[in-house]
Regions:
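N-terminal interaction/assembly modules
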Residues: 1-126
Length: 126
């Protein structure tokens, strides 16, 4: 299974966890180690990631952003800021591709804009 597929699995587990309240470990019990670790790390850093997203989503309260888009952005921000083995450009590109495939037509630009602004602020923009 490609890493992009494992990243998608982590994003979907985070999304399901947020929407249904099901325990993350239950949602990830059959997941590959990369997916499991990524989802757990994103959830552990959720407050920091949400604060960054909220600060850069001009005119949008965090709660108004679709849960799947939030999960995609949280994952990309975590990878860009905390994973030295994943280039910032890859984290952003993967997030934009996921939003193109699974979210509304405006989502890719929205996701890209928030990620770009948040990472530029942190000095991590590619």
């Amino acid at each position: 299974m490609k890493r992009s597929d494992q990243r998608r699995d982590a994003v979907f587990a985070l999304y399901q966890h947020e929407v249904t309240g099901r325990p993350l470990d239950e949602l990830l019990e059959r997941a590959k180690p990369f997916s499991r670790q990524l989802a757990e790390d994103v959830e552990a850093n959720r407050a920091e990631l949400d604060e960054l997203i909220a600060r850069h989503s001009k005119g949008w309260a965090l709660e108004r952003i679709a849960p799947l888009e939030r999960s995609i952005m949280r994952t990309a921000l975590f990878e860009a800021l905390h994973r030295d083995d994943i280039p910032v450009e890859v984290a952003i590109d993967e997030a934009v591709e996921l939003s193109k495939e699974y979210c509304g037509t405006d989502a890719p630009g929205f996701v890209n804009g928030i990620l770009g602004a948040a990472l530029a602020e942190r000095g991590a923009a590619g």
